[in-house]
Amino acid sequence: MLSIEGLHVTYGGAVQALRGVSMQIPDGEVVAVLGSNGAGKSTLLRTISGTLRLHRGRIDAGSVRFGDVDLGSRDPGQTVRLGVVQVPEGRRIFGRLTVEENLRAGGMGNRDKAAKARAQARVYEMFPVLKERSSQRGALLSGGEQQMLAIGRALMASPKVLLLDEPSLGLAPRIIGQIGEVVAEINRQGTSVLLVEQNATMALGVADTAFVLDVGEVSLSGSARELAQTDEVQRLYLGHDTDQPHAPTTGAARRTLSRWTA
């Protein structure tokens, strides 16, 4: 299990990006984190993946643990070897390399040739278009194909937990739906997923549990299905007019949803 407890993060010693954030990503589940720009979503992933220091950020308090291991003191390479792998926002593939070379780069930390071959076969099975274009340079792929390649490259490391940072960013609605299906399939194959998204429809559609980040704090949490029924999420993230009559939240939902206050 990936566990975040009481996490406080600042940039440059002055800008407080996360304030007392706590959440858990249980084994075998998809957990979604919603929030607007500047809410702290990317900072959360940077802290988990070990890349926070590269952005002049630091952990002031709290912890990030994967099982018994403290990730707060690990560098990105160590975190990947432990099985926690991030797909960064904006895809960031190697445009001058071919699809196959990008995938090989993702598996560089794995010295087991048979395991790398299995991982590549898994990627090509999940994304047949990447196999068709294996000799094509990454820069020539469409936006959706580049996102598939970014996810595939991360899967080459055989992650136990996959961190996805805004995978729907800049993609057409049809492709966003396909990305959601991919997330669900990755999870069905045994990988836990922490999905950071602004597209609440896709995220809540595939997640088991969800959290809402607001200016660095968790403002709401609960099951994804129940969160989707709240006025706040419907108004801010699903574009629904909550002044119109709708089915009331059930008693069970009210009990399990948690609103966080300072």
Regions found by a protein language model. Give the residues of each.
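A short, flexible loop at the N-terminus of ABC-type nucleotide-binding domains that lies
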Residues: 1-4, 8-20, 26-27, 52-57, ...
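ABC-type ATPase nucleotide-binding domains, specifically the catalytic core motifs of the NBD
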Residues: 12-13, 31, 52-55, 74, ...
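The feature captures the beta-strand-to-loop junction immediately N-terminal to the Walker
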Residues: 34-36
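Helix-to-loop junction immediately C-terminal to a conserved catalytic motif
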Residues: 49
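ABC ATPase NBD Q-loop/coupling interface
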Residues: 52, 63-79, 223
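Conserved ABC transporter NBD signature motif
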Residues: 59-69, 116-120
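Conserved ABC ATPase signature
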Residues: 137-141, 145
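ABC ATPase C-loop
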Residues: 154-155
